[in-house]
């Protein structure tokens, strides 16, 4: 199917999203950093398509706060399951946590990152290079 049949769309803060064929159904997604701004909004967009995205695994150290989950309709909340996972742990420990919960996925949306402490008195993003180095090192 070409782009004429599946045009791009905008959903909230997300632009140029593809439109997917309605034939694709019952997918499962992992959203890491699900209690952050980008992770939570990605989860909201996925949950707007209940036939396509049957289950969302919200993977983060803490579950999304109740105030955030209250923004979702009840039927959407029923399709979200939190998995407590610290991505600073050893890869074997992360794998065990996911496996023990029975997590499987058709797609992964990765929004987790480690924020190094800035120098005292410096703005939070003043150590952008250290932020990049820390997170690139964790993902290799």
Label every PLM stretch briefly.
Residues 139-140:
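Conserved internal alpha-helix within the Rossmann fold of NAD(P)-dependent oxidoreductases
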Residues 59-63, 87:
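N-terminal Rossmann-fold cofactor-binding loop
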Residues 54-57:
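Conserved beta-strand positions in the Rossmann-like core of class I SAM-dependent methyltransferases
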Residues 5-52:
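N-terminal Rossmann NAD(P)H-binding glycine-rich loop of SDR-like oxidoreductase domains
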Residues 32, 59, 109-113:
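SDR active-site strand-loop-helix element
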Residues 36-37, 63-64, 114-117:
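Short, solvent-exposed loop/turn segments at secondary-structure junctions
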Residues 1-2:
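Universal eukaryotic N-terminal targeting presequences
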Residues 68, 74-135:
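NAD(P)H-binding glycine-rich loop region in Rossmannoid oxidoreductase-like domains
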